[in-house]
Amino acid sequence: MKTPLITREGYETLKQELNYLWREERPEVTKKVTWAASLGDRSENADYQYNKKRLREIDRRVRYLTKCMENLKIVDYSPQQEGKVFFGAWVEIENDDGDTLKFRIVGYDEIFGRKDYISIDSPMARALLKKEVGDLAVVNTPVGEANWYVNAIEYVK
């Protein structure tokens, strides 16, 4: 189950997407559908069919964003988090082989399209929560346990 948390930046990004879809793209596509429908036979009208499909996709995304944003809890930075891994932290970790990773722990709705973001619900994030620099985090993976050491923790303030 996904945890309904989001960073302020993530919430603003979703809000901008919703505004763009509802105020700019949807009216434009609606005009195209109306124009294509006025041409007559809709069964062989590619413009009509494509734009009608796009309109359904926009409406689906708008419904999802509207419902999703009502339930999300914005988590802002707090000075009490400093020095430990919590939601919103940028974390650099290293394994026994010397491989390093750097990512930010964010909400489920923020991870798409970002390789450097992981969900708070992921096994890695769960293992890292409340750890400090130098601590060992044992992550359960499909092939067994993996050991990762926390090298750095940063917060966007």
Swiss-Prot record:
GO BP field: DNA-templated transcription elongation; regulation of DNA-templated transcription elongation
One protein family per Pfam: GreA_GreB
Top-level taxonomic group: Bacteria
Record keywords: DNA-binding, Transcription, Transcription regulation
Gene3D superfamilies assigned: Transcription elongation factor, GreA/GreB, C-terminal domain, Transcription elongation factor, GreA/GreB, N-terminal domain
Molecular function in Gene Ontology: DNA binding; RNA polymerase binding
Function comment: Necessary for efficient RNA polymerase transcription elongation past template-encoded arresting sites. The arresting sites in DNA have the property of trapping a certain fraction of elongating RNA polymerases that pass through, resulting in locked ternary complexes. Cleavage of the nascent transcript by cleavage factors such as GreA or GreB allows the resumption of elongation from the new 3'terminus. GreB releases sequences of up to 9 nucleotides in length.
PANTHER family: TRANSCRIPTION ELONGATION FACTOR GREA, TRANSCRIPTION ELONGATION FACTOR GREB
UniProt record similarity statement: Belongs to the GreA/GreB family. GreB subfamily.
Record protein name field: Transcription elongation factor GreB
Protein source organism: Salmonella typhi
UniProt lineage: Bacteria, Pseudomonadati, Pseudomonadota, Gammaproteobacteria, Enterobacterales
Encoding gene (name): greB
